[in-house]
From Swiss-Prot:
The gene is aroC. Homotetramer. It catalyses: 5-O-(1-carboxyvinyl)-3-phosphoshikimate = chorismate + phosphate. It comes from Synechococcus sp. (strain CC9311). NADP(+) binds at R47, R53. This is Chorismate synthase.
């Protein structure tokens, strides 16, 4: 339970970090969608470990195998199964963690809930679970692009206390991929890289914020009350490992404004589409997209598994210390960028199909 997401465009992920592999089944993808298989692999390459000096040194090719649902690269409308085999496991690095709970990790809560857990590699709590999400999200992104020209672009907005200045209206994927931290602000990116390296050398970790914009989103996506678009986006990105906060549009800063300043005034347009003078709403009003860019921010905590010695307890509840071995990211944000893009794309693809099914018959 808890490994499936979506209603019409639905995914189910499977696998553990140190098991045979991880993957996903995508159910509900429309037929006759021509897929760029290299684009799926490209997104997985952006997520994979060992890609730079500021990520975990674990070496995985993360080569995706597509087992079903396609004919000559075109979707059949049947379930699409994708798997990535694990190659570079080192379970010996987790010996100490078999008897001591990692502070702020899922070790203790998984043990309390299930009475058993895959300690090696973190099991389902490992970020390797997100491989399936990124692969499925790459399909969703292609569906959105082909259907409406929709673009989903995320980037690192903040690392520790270093915040970048980025214009969401003009940022490009090339700017995001222009450096290893995936921050379009080149000057700030270098400072971020230095900060991550310095904190990592201390045996510690740091967190930050990822920002994501959706351009050319369809108008009318989202449902009233419980299935509001921003609510589903929040659930989607907050289901990613290490997430601790979500904002849309003006977010918490909007609480400092008066209504007269915060309201997005509607402007007349020649084609009759909705357009606003400002976008404090973040592209969503009443839980439904209004056609303006959707802008969200996601906060990620510092990586829980660190080399610095920490106080903890063992499975018997006895006090002990833990200095985690293994290969872990000093900061998850550079690799989390494609994860955020994937989850946003999955939500939008699901709501696009729901919108078409409910409101496009006549």
């Amino acid at each position: 339970m808890g490994s499936s997401f979506g209603k019409l465009f639905r995914i189910s992920t499977f696998g553990e970090s140190h098991g045979g592999g991880v993957g996903v089944i995508v159910d509900g993808c429309p037929p006759r969608l021509k897929l760029d298989l290299e684009a799926i692999q490209a997104d997985l390459d952006r997520r994979r470990p060992g890609q730079s000096r500021i990520t975990t040194p674990r070496k995985e090719a993360d080569q995706v195998e597509i087992l079903s649902g396609l004919l000559d690269g075109v979707t059949l409308g049947t379930p699409i199964a994708m798997v990535v085999r694990n190659k570079d496991q080192r379970p010996q690095d987790y010996k100490d963690m078999e008897v001591a709970f990692r502070p702020s990790h899922a070790d203790a809560t998984y043990q309390v809930k299930y009475g058993i857990q895959a300690r090696s590699g973190g099991g389902r709590a490992s970020a390797r679970e997100t491989i399936g999400r990124v692969a499925a999200g790459a399909i969703a992104r292609q569906l959105l692009k082909q259907a409406n020209g929709t673009e989903v672009i995320a980037w690192v907005k903040q690392i520790h206390d270093l915040e970048a200045s980025v214009d969401p209206s003009s940022v490009t994927p090339e700017q995001v991929e222009g450096n290893i931290v995936r921050c379009p602000d080149a000057g700030m990116a270098e400072q971020m890289i230095q900060r991550i390296e310095a904190i990592g050398q201390e045996g510690d970790s740091c967190g930050g914020v990822i920002e994501c914009v959706v351009r050319k989103a369809s108008t009318g996506l989202g449902m009233p009350v419980f299935d509001k678009l921003e609510a589903d986006l929040a659930k989607a990105v907050m289901s990613l490992p290490a997430t601790k906060g979500f904002e849309i549009g003006s977010g918490f800063a909007g609480t400092l404004l008066k209504g007269s300043a915060h309201n997005d005034a509607f402007l007349p347009t020649q084609d009759g589409t909705l357009h606003t003078a400002t976008n404090y709403s973040g592209g969503i009003q009443g839980g439904i997209s209004n056609g303006e860019p959707i802008l969200i921010r996601v906060a990620f905590k510092p990586t829980a598994t660190i080399r610095k010695e920490q106080q903890t307890i063992n499975a018997a509840g006895e006090a002990t210390t833990l200095s985690a071995k293994g290969r872990h990211d000093p900061c998850v944000l550079p690799r989390a960028v494609p994860m955020v893009e994937a989850m946003v794309s999955l939500v939008l693809a699901d709501h696009l199909l729901r919108q078409q099914g409910q409101c496009s018959l006549w």
